[in-house]
Regions:
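RNA-contacting regions in translation and RNA-metabolism proteins
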Residues: 1-110
Length: 110
């Protein structure tokens, strides 16, 4: 699985003309792939959309011939984007919760 993910990502990055080191860890939770290099903003994309799309494609390639029970979760990250984004969303949720408590007005979902 690691080799399949590596080869696929290497080809995609080459087509995008992006120089990056690909580090892959096989954990109990699945494959954790970290891309390291300059100008990773192009890999992240707007609000992580490019990163999410690449993660989805890698997951499809890795799990192509697997059954439902053998599915391997794939997480693709760069520059610690995923944990930074999670922190940002938690801060936003807390701010909105404080506003609701303060104003006692219902908040519309986003």
């Amino acid at each position: 699985e690691k080799d399949i993910a590596y080869r696929f990502l290497r080809e995609v990055l080459n087509c995008m003309d992006v120089k990056a080191e690909i580090k892959i860890k096989h954990t109990e939770a699945g494959l954790y792939i970290n891309l390291i290099g300059p100008k990773m903003g192009i890999i992240i994309g707007r609000r992580g959309q490019t990163l999410d799309s690449l993660q989805y494609l890698v997951s499809l390639v890795v799990n192509k011939d697997k059954g439902r029970d053998d599915y391997l979760r794939v997480v693709l990250d760069t520059e610690n984007y995923r944990s930074k984004r999670e922190e940002t969303l938690i801060r936003l949720a807390n701010r909105l919760a404080e506003r609701v408590v303060k104003t006692r007005k219902r908040m519309e979902s986003i």
